[in-house]
C-alpha cells in the first residue's frame, strides 16, 4: 500500500488547496473519489484489466504536483510547430493539466459551441457541466479514475449543440513542461448533442527531459444521430508515463470513431470503455503501436452492447522491436436482449526481434442468441520468404524489412477519416521505422 499511501496523505493534507483552485462542480465529487481510491488502492496484476502493467510501480516515485496552479513559463506557439499540412484546425493547448488561455485561436466558433477551460465553464455554467461531469467515469470501479477525479483541477470542456457540425477539426496539444519531475492530472469532457458532428486530434508531447506521470480521463457523450471522431497521438519520450482512461457513451443512431496511435513513449496504458445506450449505433476503434528499446504499451478495451442493432469494429496492430513490450486485452460484452449485434475484434502483432514480447487477449462475452460476433489475434514475425524474395530483386534487407512493417501497420492508418491526417501519419510512421524520427516530427519540443 506504499504507492497509495503517499496520495492518501497528499489529499488529506492538501485537499483545501486543491479545492480552492478548482470549480465547485469538480469539488462536489472529489471527496467521494478520495474514499473510492482509499478503498480500491492501485490494482495489482491479479486484477484482470491490469495484469499486463504494474500500476503500483508506475505510481511509486515521488512526483511533484502544481496544486497552487502556478503559471508555467512556456509559449506554445514558440515551441510547437507540429501541424498537419492541409488540415484546417482550431488549435488549443493544455500545458501540463491547465488550459492555456493565452493561446486561444482566432477562429469564430459555431453558435453555441463551447471550447474552454473545464474549470472556468464549471464556474460560469455549473448546471451544464454538472449534468455530465463524472457520470461516465466511475470512481467506484477504477482506482486511476478515482485518483484523477480526486486531484484534477482543470482540463478541457467541449460542447457542441444540437445539429451543429464543426467546420474545423479541433486539435488539442497536450504539452508536458517542468524543471522537476512532475505528475499531472488532465480532465477532458466532450458533449455532442443530437445531430452534432465533430472531429478531434489530441497530440501528446513532452517539452522537457524530465520524468513525467500523466493521468488523463476523457468523458465523451455522443447524442442521437451525432458523429464523433477522436484521434489520440502520442509522441513523448522514454521518461514519460501515460495512463489514459477514455469513456464514451453513444445514443440512438450515433457514430463514434476512436483512433489511438503510439509512436514514442516510455510506459503507456490506454483504457477505453464504450457503451451503446441507443439502437442503431456503430463504433470504430483502432490502435497503432510502434515500439522499440524498452517501451511498454498496453491497450485495454471494453465494448458494452446494452441494446440491439449496434455494430462495433476493433482493429489494433503492434510492431515491436528490441526489448519492447506490448499488450492488448479487448472485451466485447453483448448483454441479454442485445439482439442483431454485429461485432468484429482483431489484434494483429509483429515482433521484429527475438526479445520483443506481446500479450494478447481478445474476449467475447455473449448473452444474446441472434448475433454475429468474431474475434481473433495473431503474433508473428516477418516472413523470411518475403524478405528473401525482395532481396533477390535487389532490395536491401533492411529496406525490405521496413517496407513489410510499413505495409503491415498501414491498414490501421488507412481507416482514419481525415485524409490530411492519414497522409501525415504515413510520413511519420515511415520516418519512425527508418530511425529518422526520434521524437516529435516537425517541432523542437523534445530537442
Residue locations for each model-derived region?
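N-terminal amphipathic, basic helical "cap/leader" segment at the start of enzyme domains
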Residues: 1-146, 315, 321
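Conserved beta-strand/loop scaffold segments within soluble protein domains that form the structured core
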Residues: 111-115, 124-395, 409, 413-447
Amino acid at each position: 500500500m506504499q504507492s497509495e499511501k503517499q496520495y492518501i496523505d497528499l489529499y488529506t493534507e492538501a485537499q483545501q488547496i486543491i479545492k480552492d483552485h478548482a470549480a465547485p462542480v469538480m469539488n462536489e465529487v472529489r471527496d467521494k473519489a478520495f474514499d473510492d481510491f482509499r478503498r480500491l488502492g492501485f490494482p495489482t496484476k491479479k486484477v484482470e484489466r491490469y495484469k499486463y502493467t504494474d500500476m503500483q510501480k508506475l505510481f511509486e516515485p515521488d512526483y511533484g504536483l502544481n496544486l497552487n496552479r502556478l503559471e508555467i513559463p512556456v509559449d506554445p506557439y514558440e515551441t510547437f510547430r507540429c501541424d498537419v499540412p492541409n488540415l484546417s484546425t482550431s488549435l488549443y493547448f493544455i500545458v501540463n493539466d491547465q488550459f492555456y488561455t493565452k493561446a486561444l485561436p482566432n477562429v469564430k466558433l459555431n453558435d453555441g459551441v463551447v471550447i474552454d477551460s473545464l474549470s472556468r465553464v464549471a464556474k460560469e455554467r455549473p448546471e451544464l457541466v454538472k449534468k455530465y461531469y463524472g457520470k461516465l467515469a466511475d470512481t467506484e470501479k477504477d482506482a486511476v479514475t478515482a485518483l484523477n477525479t480526486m486531484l484534477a483541477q482543470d482540463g478541457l470542456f467541449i460542447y457542441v449543440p444540437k445539429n451543429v457540425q464543426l467546420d474545423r477539426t479541433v486539435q488539442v496539444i497536450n504539452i508536458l513542461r517542468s524543471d522537476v519531475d512532475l505528475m499531472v492530472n488532465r480532465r477532458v469532457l466532450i458533449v455532442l448533442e443530437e445531430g452534432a458532428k465533430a472531429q478531434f486530434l489530441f497530440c501528446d508531447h513532452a517539452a522537457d527531459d524530465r520524468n513525467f506521470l500523466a493521468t488523463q480521463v476523457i468523458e465523451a457523450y455522443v447524442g442521437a444521430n451525432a458523429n464523433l471522431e477522436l484521434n489520440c497521438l502520442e509522441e513523448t519520450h522514454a521518461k514519460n508515463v501515460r495512463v489514459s482512461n477514455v469513456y464514451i457513451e453513444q445514443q440512438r443512431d450515433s457514430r463514434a470513431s476512436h483512433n489511438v496511435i503510439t509512436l514514442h513513449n516510455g510506459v503507456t496504458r490506454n483504457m477505453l470503455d464504450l457503451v451503446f445506450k441507443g439502437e442503431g449505433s456503430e463504433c470504430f476503434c483502432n490502435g497503432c503501436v510502434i515500439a522499440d528499446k524498452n517501451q511498454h504499451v498496453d491497450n485495454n478495451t471494453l465494448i458494452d452492447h446494452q441494446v440491439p442493432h449496434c455494430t462495433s469494429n476493433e482493429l489494433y496492430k503492434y510492431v515491436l522491436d528490441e526489448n519492447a513490450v506490448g499488450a492488448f486485452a479487448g472485451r466485447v460484452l453483448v448483454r441479454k436482449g442485445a439482439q442483431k449485434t454485429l461485432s468484429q475484434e482483431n489484434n494483429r502483432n509483429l515482433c521484429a526481434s527475438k526479445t520483443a514480447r506481446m500479450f494478447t487477449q481478445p474476449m467475447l462475452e455473449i448473452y444474446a442468441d441472434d448475433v454475429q460476433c468474431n474475434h481473433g489475434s495473431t503474433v508473428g514475425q516477418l516472413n523470411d520468404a518475403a524478405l528473401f524474395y525482395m532481396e533477390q530483386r535487389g532490395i536491401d534487407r533492411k529496406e525490405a524489412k521496413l517496407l513489410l512493417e510499413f505495409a503491415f501497420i498501414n491498414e490501421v492508418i488507412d481507416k482514419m477519416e481525415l485524409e490530411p491526417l492519414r497522409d501525415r501519419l504515413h510520413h511519420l510512421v515511415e520516418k519512425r521505422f527508418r530511425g529518422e524520427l526520434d521524437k516529435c516530427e516537425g517541432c523542437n519540443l523534445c530537442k
